[in-house]
Amino acid sequence: FLNYRDSGMIDSPTTSNPECFWQANIEEASLRLSNLLCEESVDLLVIYDPNGGYGHPDHIQVHRVGTHWADQTGIENIRWTTLNRDSIKKTIELAIETAPDEGLAGIGDDLEERRQRVEEESFGSAESEITHAINVSDFIEKKRAAISSHRSQIDEDSFFLKIPNDQFVNIFGTEWFINPKESRKENETFKSNLFD
């Protein structure tokens, strides 16, 4: 966090803490990033998309600070990590259909709320905007454990922790990225190397 505090979600009182990352001055945070990376030879910078993935203030700030730092240092090879809005929407719709059969009765309101949230343009990115897809399904159990331990973002009764493994893989088995300097043509396959 470049020695800033976690901001919490946008509606949390912690976002008004002057020591949290959300409140950080972009120039100052960029200088801290520069000090951290001064001995590195940066070939590629990976930051969040402008939405911060799902709207987390710290993720949005990572985008702002990283973009500013790249502009100041002349780094042109940037990738935005994002969420595939279309893929998540399909998985949520499948979960709504199969919830009773999968023993997930009682999470219908959570699923409906998430379906509506995924419809918003401030959540992730449309698949048509995504240029890179990296298969990380070999690490799915580690990802599930990491998400489960991230209590400031995920409640223990969250849909994401209750869905069957195949649906979890649909959402989290691929990492999605955007090259903001190019677009993917219709029907063109996703690139699988961030340096391409």
Q: What are these language model-derived features?
A:
Residues 14-15, 24-196:
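Metal-dependent de-N-acetylase/amidase catalytic core
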Residues 20-22:
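The substrate-binding groove and active-site-proximal loops of carbohydrate-active enzymes
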Residues 1-11:
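A conserved beta-strand->alpha-helix junction
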